[in-house]
């Protein structure tokens, strides 16, 4: 992992396939006059960030030894210490820019989606499942869109008319009640709508058809995934990623890219407009359903999101508070996407240990448990990673030490399991 204070912007215009996902190949101009932080001047967000030499960074960011296995960290690339060892304070302007595209043709997916078929699950069932996993079982239309894009790859490439079907089901008042709320208390004119399932205990009987259940049984993620979804144990995807990137460029939706976005934010890296080198298309198969459940309030994207420090609470959470800005190398980006289940296991372990920043594990832990050589490489590993696979085989490393054991099912879910059996 390298320390990097430069901002490079990649207008995506070419894509190639590799392995289980499609890396986004970019061409860019090194003479670009666009500057990320200058672009955020309209938000007026300034923060005093102490920066210091971090020769002891790997030790200070390690998780407590009782939480994760004791494994030696590899050497991290960093800037050489300067002559002045005293921490200096500089004012740095940071913020988040929404990816607003004038046309979807600006960024095109590389996937050959001719073999993708719409999941035979009704829109009313999709809306009900999204609502079931929302805090207080209340959800906005945008929350339903994000939930669908997050979990079913077909909709990332489909014509967006499906969103009209979602809105129609929510507003039909046959199965959902409507509430209004003010996302900004200071602005009385702006109001949003929440939708609530009528008779939430009757979702199975009223809203899920036999065809829906047949699809659940055949899904590659297994019946347990939908069992958790029925029980509300999946949760909603984190909203800020979808309001900035996922809804605007749907084929970049999904748990893998969402995790990358928040981990970068935790490292002090704000992803710039169309800076797509960090993201991948995961269209060959559905995600592995290893993501932990996040619980956060709905955040409506306004200028106050990046201008209020409280709304950027993940910023720098993966580093010491007096951090330098770290970045992923291209090789580490590949590893992050390939080993996403290991990353989610680290999050879950941090959560079990009651660590405050469990959503964004420390840089040291990501390097050790996600980029480390103790995790197995999947089939069709790109050439750039074959050296890691070879070393792992020579060392006799086969199993992921963070792989979760299957646990006994919650008795409260037995009825759901029986319904899905």
Swiss-Prot record:
InterPro entries, alphabetized: Fork_head_dom, FOX_domain-containing, TF_fork_head_CS_2, WH-like_DNA-bd_sf, WH_DNA-bd_sf
Keyword field: DNA-binding, Nucleus, Transcription
Description of the deletion phenotype: RNAi-mediated knockdown causes significant reduction in the expression of 21U-RNAs, upon simultaneous knockdown of fkh-4 and fkh-5.
Leader sequence segment: none
Gene Ontology annotations for the cellular component aspect, listed alphabetically: nucleus
Gene3D superfamilies membership: Winged helix-like DNA-binding domain superfamily/Winged helix DNA-binding domain
GO biological process, one term: cell differentiation
Residue spans binding DNA: 118-218
GO MF assignments: DNA-binding transcription factor activity, RNA polymerase II-specific; RNA polymerase II cis-regulatory region sequence-specific DNA binding; RNA polymerase II transcription regulatory region sequence-specific DNA binding
A family per Pfam: Forkhead
Predominant place of localization: nucleus
Transmembrane segments: none
Localization per Swiss-Prot or TrEMBL: Nucleus
Main function: Transcription factor. Binds to DNA sequence motif 5'-CTGTTTCA-3'. Regulates expression of a class of small RNAs, known as 21U-RNAs, perhaps acting redundantly with fkh-4 and fkh-5.
Name listed for the protein in its UniProt record: Forkhead box protein fkh-3
Organism: Caenorhabditis elegans
Lineage: Eukaryota, Metazoa, Ecdysozoa, Nematoda, Chromadorea
Gene: fkh-3
């Amino acid at each position: 992992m390298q320390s990097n204070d430069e901002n490079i912007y990649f207008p995506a215009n070419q894509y190639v396939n590799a392995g289980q996902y499609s890396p986004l190949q970019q061409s860019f101009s090194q003479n670009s006059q666009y500057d990320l932080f200058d672009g955020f001047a309209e938000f007026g967000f300034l923060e005093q960030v102490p920066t210091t030499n971090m020769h002891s960074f790997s030790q200070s960011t390690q998780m407590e030894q009782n939480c994760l296995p004791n494994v030696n960290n590899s050497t991290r690339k960093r800037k050489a210490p300067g002559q002045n060892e005293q921490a200096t304070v500089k004012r740095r302007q940071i913020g988040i820019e929404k990816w607003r595209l004038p046309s979807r043709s600006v960024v095109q997916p590389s996937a050959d989606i001719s073999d993708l078929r719409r999941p035979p699950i009704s829109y009313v069932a999709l809306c009900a499942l999204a609502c079931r996993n929302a805090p207080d079982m209340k959800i906005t239309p945008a929350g339903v869109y994000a939930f669908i894009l997050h979990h079913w790859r077909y909709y990332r490439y489909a014509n967006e008319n499906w969103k009209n079907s979602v809105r129609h089901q929510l507003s039909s008042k046959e199965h959902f009640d409507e509430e209004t709320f003010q996302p900004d208390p200071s602005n009385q004119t702006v109001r949003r709508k929440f939708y609530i399932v009528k008779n939430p205990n009757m979702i199975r009987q009223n809203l899920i058809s036999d065809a829906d259940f047949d699809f659940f049984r055949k899904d590659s993620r297994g019946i347990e995934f939908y069992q958790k979804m029925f029980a509300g144990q999946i949760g909603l995807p984190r909203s800020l990623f979808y309001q900035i990137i996922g809804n605007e460029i749907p084929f970049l939706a999904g748990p893998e890219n969402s995790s990358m976005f928040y981990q970068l934010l935790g490292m002090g890296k704000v992803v710039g407009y169309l800076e797509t080198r960090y993201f991948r298309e995961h269209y060959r198969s559905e995600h592995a359903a290893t993501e932990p459940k996040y619980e956060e309030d709905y955040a409506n994207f306004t200028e106050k999101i990046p201008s209020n420090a409280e709304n950027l609470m993940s910023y720098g959470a993966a580093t010491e508070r007096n951090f330098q800005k770290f970045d992923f190398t291209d090789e580490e980006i590949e590893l992050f996407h390939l080993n996403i289940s290991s990353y989610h296991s680290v999050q879950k372990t941090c959560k079990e240990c009651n660590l405050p920043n469990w959503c964004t594990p420390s840089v040291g832990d990501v390097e050790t448990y996600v980029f480390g050589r103790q995790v197995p490489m999947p089939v069709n590993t790109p050439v750039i990673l074959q050296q890691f696979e070879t070393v792992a085989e020579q060392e006799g490393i086969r199993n992921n030490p963070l792989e979760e054991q299957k646990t006994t099912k919650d008795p409260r879910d037995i009825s759901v399991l029986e319904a899905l059996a």
